[in-house]
Amino acid sequence: MEIKLYEDRYRDDMIFMVLQAKDALGRIPSINEDLLDIKKNYFDRGDMFWIAADDNDRVIGCGGYSRIEGTNEAFIHRLYIKASEKRKGIGSALLETIEVGMRGNGITAARVHLDDPPEQWFESYSFYPKHGYAEYEPRYMRKKL
């Protein structure tokens, strides 16, 4: 497994992986519009986005961040792991990469917005606290970097 900056050649494979990940969670698969143009929605704004690729260069995870305007904080976005690849440390490795990228760009705190209800998104609600995130209001967690 290798984590690398997103490139457009991974677009379709990443979108397919995200749809599979949502389906595995019992959600109706739909695509978030920001994933259709990572360059415009992340890189052109000074934000970052990564993918995790397996040994066959297939996308098995993704995630990025966007700075909160007027602050030294950023939201983590679209941290997804392919269902068959969960519990192998890929999510933790992606999160660490995202946090290192944030620190390198002067970001001092990371935030994450979690979906509702928590029972359907139990993995997210347990994943982030294991990595030092604490809830600061319902459905939102934060970590000082």
Annotate the PLM regions.
Residues 1-2:
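Extreme N-terminal starter segment of soluble prokaryotic enzymes
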Residues 81, 87-100, 126, 130:
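Conserved acetyl-CoA-binding loop-helix of GNAT-fold acetyltransferases
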Residues 95, 119-124, 140-145:
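Short glycine/proline-centered loop/turn elements that form peptide/ligand docking sites
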Residues 112-128:
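Short, charged helix-to-loop "capping" segments that act as catalytic/coupling loops
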Residues 128-138:
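Conserved acetyl-CoA-binding loop of GNAT-fold acetyltransferases
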